[in-house]
Amino acid sequence: MVKLRLKRCGRKQRAVYRIVAIDVRSRREGRDLRKVGFYDPITNQTYLNLPAILDFLKKGAQPTRTVHDISKKAGIFTELNLNKTKLN
């Protein structure tokens, strides 16, 4: 199973995170399938690759709680629901 979760980068006391699609059995800093975003909690900057995230969500990837909250603020789930209603 694939999850969308945070991967810690940066230096000591100055963490930044990459949002990655990664296998559930991998470690936090393990090999990821694809980098789909970036999150800096100190400056509150976020970059999300929306097409890649939507593609993984459509294939069944599960976001962690933190990635879900970040994505919700960016409006990804409203876009995903709009795409579903267009298909029906």
Curated annotation (Swiss-Prot):
GO CC, any one term: chloroplast
Keyword Ribonucleoprotein set for record: yes
One Gene Ontology molecular-function label: structural constituent of ribosome
Keywords, in A-Z order: Chloroplast, Plastid, Ribonucleoprotein, Ribosomal protein
Main location: plastid
GO biological process, one term: mitochondrial translation
SUPFAM superfamilies listed in its UniProt record: Ribosomal protein S16
Subcellular location: Plastid, Chloroplast
InterPro entries: Ribosomal_bS16, Ribosomal_bS16_CS, Ribosomal_bS16_dom_sf
Family to which this protein belongs: Belongs to the bacterial ribosomal protein bS16 family.
Protein name: Small ribosomal subunit protein bS16c
Species per Swiss-Prot/TrEMBL record: Sinapis alba
